[in-house]
């Protein structure tokens, strides 16, 4: 977990009726995330805080699910004291930034999640296999956690065979911009009653997309939907994520999968 924050503000009193202020603040955050787990996994490890999202890579802990966000905001405010009973406050603001969460993705290969149900003792039917899986879960962290070195070795083999990477780290991104204008007026009718009204206008644009964050030693990735390949076998059109560029080859830093705007 790594987080910082800042807040800066300055105000200028123009005269008895008018003042303006400028405020900016933000909080860049980077944190490892938790994956959902089953009671079986908790019981095997005697640990209700078990998190299957991490594992050791060259002796160091690495989390596959890391969230980063930074959305700084700037506000310009004008205060107008119309008279002793009436005040008008207007603010124009701008927020921009990005939020992204990484995750493992894989193609035509074994599920890399250590708590995938096929890898659990409860999935086994032979008692000797149940005992073996139970022992491995309780005594070998390369079984109960992500085996990063294994994923790299599988990708190196794919490189040698001239095939696409079997495992990658993707980042699911939302890059946003938001403009805000708000104006509020308050008027005191008497000691016990006041009137308040205002206007609030907002414009939001968010770009939602995926990007390859880490090839995990692989050479390339083909931008197709493997679930569509499975469900519509033989249909080479439905499986394409980008119909304008079928079977597009993508690498680290490239956008793939989906890319659209929300408003």
Task: Annotate each language-model stretch with its function.
Residues 60-103, 164-200, 207-208, 252-263:
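Outer-membrane beta-barrel transmembrane strands
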Residues 1-2, 11-17, 82:
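Outer-membrane beta-barrel pore proteins
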Residues 19-77, 100-174, 234-251:
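Acidic/polar loop-and-plug regions of large Gram-negative outer-membrane beta-barrel proteins
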């Amino acid at each position: 977990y790594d987080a910082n924050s800042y807040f800066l503000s300055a105000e200028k009193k123009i005269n008895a009726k008018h003042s303006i202020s400028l405020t900016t603040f933000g909080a860049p955050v980077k944190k490892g995330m938790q994956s959902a787990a089953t009671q079986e996994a908790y019981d095997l490890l005697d640990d209700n805080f078990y998190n299957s999202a991490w594992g050791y890579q060259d002796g160091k802990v690495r989390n596959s699910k890391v969230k980063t966000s930074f959305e700084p905001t700037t506000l310009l405010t004008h205060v107008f004291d119309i008279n002793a009973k009436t005040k008008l406050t207007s603010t124009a603001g701008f927020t921009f930034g990005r939020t992204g969460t990484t995750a493992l993705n894989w193609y035509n290969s074994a599920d890399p999640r250590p708590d995938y149900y096929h890898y659990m003792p409860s999935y086994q039917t032979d008692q000797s296999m149940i005992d073996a899986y139970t022992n491995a879960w309780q005594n070998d962290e390369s079984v109960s956690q992500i085996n990063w070195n294994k994923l790299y070795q599988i990708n190196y083999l794919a490189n040698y065979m001239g095939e696409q990477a079997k495992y990658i780290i993707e980042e699911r991104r939302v890059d946003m911009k938001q403009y805000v204008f708000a104006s509020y007026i308050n008027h005191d009718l008497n000691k016990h009653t006041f009137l308040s009204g205002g206007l609030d206008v907002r414009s939001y644009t968010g770009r939602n997309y995926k990007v390859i964050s880490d090839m995990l030693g692989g050479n390339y990735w083909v931008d197709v939907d493997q679930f569509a390949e499975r469900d519509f076998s033989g249909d080479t059109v439905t499986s394409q994520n980008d119909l304008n560029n079928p079977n597009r080859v993508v690498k680290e830093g490239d956008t793939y999968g989906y890319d659209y705007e929300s408003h």
